[in-house]
C-alpha cells in the first residue's frame, strides 16, 4: 500500500536506537526470485517486505500441518501486487498477503485468486469480510491511519488536542500538522481517503483548501513526517521538530513505549480517534498455485487464534478474529477506534487517481 505501521516500525525503531523485530521465515526467507513451492512440503507466501511472525508460531504451523513456510518478500504491497499481476496464472508462490482495501479491487479485477473459504472464517469480524460472497480473499488484520499528537506540547500549552477532522481547521491548530504526500505515501493516501469519507466527493477539496490555509505541512513519506517533523516521536525530539501533530497510526503510541529504554509508564503520544481511516489487509490463494493444499492450510492458519494473537507485537496491527486477545501493551497504550472512516474498495479503485490528482493540484502545486 502501502506503508502501514508495519512498514514504519523499522524506521521508528532505528530512531529509538535499537533494531526492529527480525523478519520471519528463517533460512527460507527470500527477497527476490522464486518459482512457487519447490515441494509439496513447502508453501510459499508472497508478501510485502514487512510480513513478520514469531519463530515459535511458524514452527507450530509446520508441526500442525507438515508444511514449512517460505516467505518471498517483494517490496511494498503495491509493488508486490504488481509483480503478481505480471505473473498471473504462473504465480511465484501459493498465497499472496498484503492487498489492503485500497488495492483489493485491483487484485480481484485481475483474477489473481482461486476462491477458498478458510476454516474459522465465521470467527472473523463480519465488517472485514469485503469479499464474503465469493471467498477470493481472507481478511487477516486491520489498522488505522490517524492523526497522532505530542502530549507534552499540548499539556505545556494548556491546549486540548484535536479530536476530529473538523478540529484540525481551527485557528488553535494552525501550523501544527504535518502529513505525508497522498501521491507517494500510504498514510498520506489514507488520510486523504478519510477526508473523502467524512466530507464526501463534493466536499473534500474545500476541506483541503481550508487545511492548507491553516498551515498543514506536506512531506514525502512517513519516516520524514514522523521521525523528522513530529515533536512527539523519539526521532523528532532529537531533531528538535516543531510539529506536534502528525498523520501516523493508532498503534504508534504502543510502539513508542515498546522501543523506549527505559520504558515509560505513559505513552508520549496520543491519537485523535476522530481522524482515523481503517485499513484491512487480505490474503488469497493464488490462481495456479503449485501447492494448493498447502496454500489452503496457510490461509486457515493466518486466521487461527495462535497467529492472530502473534501479529500485534510483530506487525503492529489488530487481529480480525473476534476471540483473539490483544497484548497488554496494546490494551494499555493503544487507541480504540470505534468509528473509523471507510471507503468501499470499488469506489477507491474507480476514483483514487482522480482524488490524488485533485489533492495534488490543491495542496502541493
Where is each model-derived feature located?
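Short beta-strand->loop
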Residues: 114-122, 136-138, 166, 244, ...
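Pocket-flanking alpha-helical
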Residues: 55-59, 77-113, 122-133, 228, ...
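Early extracytoplasmic/lumenal segment of secretory-pathway proteins
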Residues: 25-27, 35-106, 365
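Ligand-binding pocket segment of bilobal, Venus flytrap-like solute-binding proteins
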Residues: 187, 194-274
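Mature extracytoplasmic/periplasmic domains
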Residues: 283-342
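Periplasmic solute-binding protein
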Residues: 101-112, 132-160, 188-196, 278-284
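A structural signal for short loop-to-beta-strand junctions that line the ligand-binding cleft
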Residues: 91-96, 114-149, 166, 176-182
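C-terminal motif of bacterial Sec signal peptides marking the signal peptidase cleavage site
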Residues: 19-23
